């Protein structure tokens, strides 16, 4: 990953790098890999995340249809 530093503005370059890393999911992956996760725990976590995503999508869909 590469970020260009313009006009010696390191703070802006760091913000851009952090945003790119966040978008790529690097921080989330690092947090998950700090400790070993048993395969059964991983499946349970992924299933819970999928359920959460589905609920959020359904809620958004209902809200959109309710607005019409």
From Swiss-Prot:
It comes from the Bacteria. One of its GO terms (biological process) is translation. The keyword DNA repair does not apply. The keyword Ribosomal protein applies. GO terms for molecular function: structural constituent of ribosome. GO terms for cellular component: ribonucleoprotein complex; ribosome. Gene3D superfamilies: Ribosomal protein S8. Keywords: Ribonucleoprotein, Ribosomal protein. It comes from Jannaschia sp. (strain CCS1). This is Small ribosomal subunit protein bS21. Pfam families: Ribosomal_S21. PANTHER family: MITOCHONDRIAL 28S RIBOSOMAL PROTEIN S21 (PTHR21109), SMALL RIBOSOMAL SUBUNIT PROTEIN BS21M (PTHR21109:SF0).
């Amino acid at each position: 990953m590469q970020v260009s530093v313009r006009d010696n503005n390191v703070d802006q370059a760091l913000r851009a790098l952090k945003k790119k890393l966040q978008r790529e999911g690097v921080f989330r992956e690092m947090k998950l890999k700090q400790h070993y996760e048993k395969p059964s725990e991983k499946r349970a976590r992924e299933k819970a995340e999928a359920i959460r995503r589905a609920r959020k999508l359904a809620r958004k869909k209902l809200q959109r249809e309710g607005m019409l």
